[in-house]
């Protein structure tokens, strides 16, 4: 509005104009206040430390790589020696060849009865790999009594349908699920290494038929884990049909169960437990992992990284002492096998007093204050459960190690194109991981599951 219009207006016409201008000023002041708050928030973010593998769950592969140091240009230092290591002799060789000396260098013959063992070594080789094809001929005849046709039944170990036996199926499942070999490369491996012509479709059909026997074994594994007193759990993302799903792991001392589902919510462990309440649950601080057991042990390794992030952000009151407290607790946890119960109880009392002292501190830095408040509210009774039971670990490394192959599988294969593929892979992970606990090779575990 031009000044001339304002000068020519009387006071009655200016009153609504002034009111609208005051309203506009209030609106602009509110907008300015919101923008200033947003600027302060962004400036605060600029001052936060970057996420690294040491202060967050960022994997080491995504961390900053330090430059390698140039080798010193002088006299090369001698490497410290170490005892030599040789392959041990096989305790049960498949065959033995006794080689006797024939004659001395002077020409005199040497009798075998006069010779003693001078040296023994193993020669290991593979026989020629060739598929064995068995033709099944089912015969029939007319019953001489009732004149009905009687046809021979096929053998149970060589049923009609797919021509490929459990040896081929187990190798395909192992190479694809454990070694991340694609269907295309599996065709080349079977042809070039095993001398077997097979198509990608046949491989897919093989794996699809494994759904039923694998599910039977996986259900038994789930029951073992479900009824265990101590359960560790973790989850990682999975790609199914182009969408983000979640692979959950539930581990006990004698079995490991995997499942791939569309959600990361609390409904997954609730459905898995089916009303059973274990003694102790080990996990990170994810809300979906809480309130499933009588006691809960938080992973101290996760909390050490959280404390390190608060230290990097500038907290020098709570986070440094809390990190030292967690590291001391982990050291005691690793030494429990050599400690008496009374000694462990003494360490528990000392650590509880130290935790009380730390929680009485009042950090001024925002991240340190958030960490301290979170520990005070949700984690105070979930840090030292491992000192009350020897079968409880202070960290959840068993779950992270169990999910690591699945993370590599996801990166190599880019996920699953079908729901049944994800289900078969989860059951395969359960079978292989449980077999390793009982000192069985992955291939042996797969073959045993197929035979069910």
Q: What is the predicted function of each stretch?
A:
Residues 1-162, 232-233, 283:
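Short, flexible loop/hinge motifs at secondary-structure junctions
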Residues 11, 136-452:
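Catalytic center-proximal scaffold of phosphoryl-transfer enzymes
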């Amino acid at each position: 509005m031009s000044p001339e219009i304002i000068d020519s207006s009387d006071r009655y016409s200016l009153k609504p104009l002034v009111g609208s201008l005051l309203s506009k000023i209030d609106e602009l002041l509110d907008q300015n206040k919101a923008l200033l708050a947003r600027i302060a928030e962004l400036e605060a973010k600029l001052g936060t430390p970057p996420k690294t593998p040491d202060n967050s769950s960022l994997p080491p592969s995504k961390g900053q790589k330090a430059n390698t140091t140039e080798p010193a240009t002088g006299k090369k230092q001698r490497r410290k020696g170490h005892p030599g290591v040789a392959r041990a002799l096989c305790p049960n060789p498949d065959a033995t060849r006794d080689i006797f000396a024939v004659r001395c260098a002077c020409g005199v013959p040497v009798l075998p009865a006069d010779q003693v063992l001078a040296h023994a070594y193993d020669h290991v080789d593979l026989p020629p790999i060739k598929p064995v094809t068995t033709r099944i001929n089912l015969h029939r005849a007319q019953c001489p009594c009732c004149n009905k046709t009687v046809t021979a039944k096929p053998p149970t170990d060589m049923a009609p349908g797919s021509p490929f036996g459990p040896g081929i199926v187990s190798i395909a499942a192992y190479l694809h699920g454990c070694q991340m070999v694609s269907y295309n490369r599996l065709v080349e491996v079977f042809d070039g290494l095993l001398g077997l012509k097979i198509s990608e479709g046949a491989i897919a059909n093989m794996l699809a038929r494994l759904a039923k026997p694998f599910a039977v074994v996986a259900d038994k594994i789930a029951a073992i884990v479900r009824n265990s007193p101590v359960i560790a759990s973790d989850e990682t993302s999975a790609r199914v049909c182009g969408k983000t799903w979640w692979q959950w792991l539930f581990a006990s001392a004698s079995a490991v169960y995997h499942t791939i589902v569309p959600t990361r919510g609390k409904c997954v462990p609730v459905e898995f437990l089916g009303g059973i309440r274990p003694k102790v649950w080990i996990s990170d601080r994810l809300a979906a992992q809480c309130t499933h057991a009588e006691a809960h042990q938080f992973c101290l390794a996760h909390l050490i990284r959280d404390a390190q992030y608060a230290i990097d952000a500038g907290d020098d009151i709570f986070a440094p002492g809390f990190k030292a407290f967690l590291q001391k607790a982990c050291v005691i946890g690793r030494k429990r096998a050599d400690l008496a119960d009374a000694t462990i109880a003494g360490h528990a009392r000392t650590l509880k007093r130290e935790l009380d002292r730390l929680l009485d501190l009042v950090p001024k830095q925002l991240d340190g204050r958030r960490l301290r408040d979170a520990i005070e509210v949700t984690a105070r009774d979930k840090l030292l459960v491992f000192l009350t039971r020897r079968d409880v670990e202070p960290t959840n490394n068993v779950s992270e190690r169990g999910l690591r192959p699945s993370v590599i599988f996801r990166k190599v294969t880019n996920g699953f194109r079908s729901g049944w593929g994800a289900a078969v892979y989860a059951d395969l992970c359960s079978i292989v991981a449980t077999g390793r606990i009982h000192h069985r090779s992955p291939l042996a575990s797969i073959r045993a599951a197929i035979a069910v």
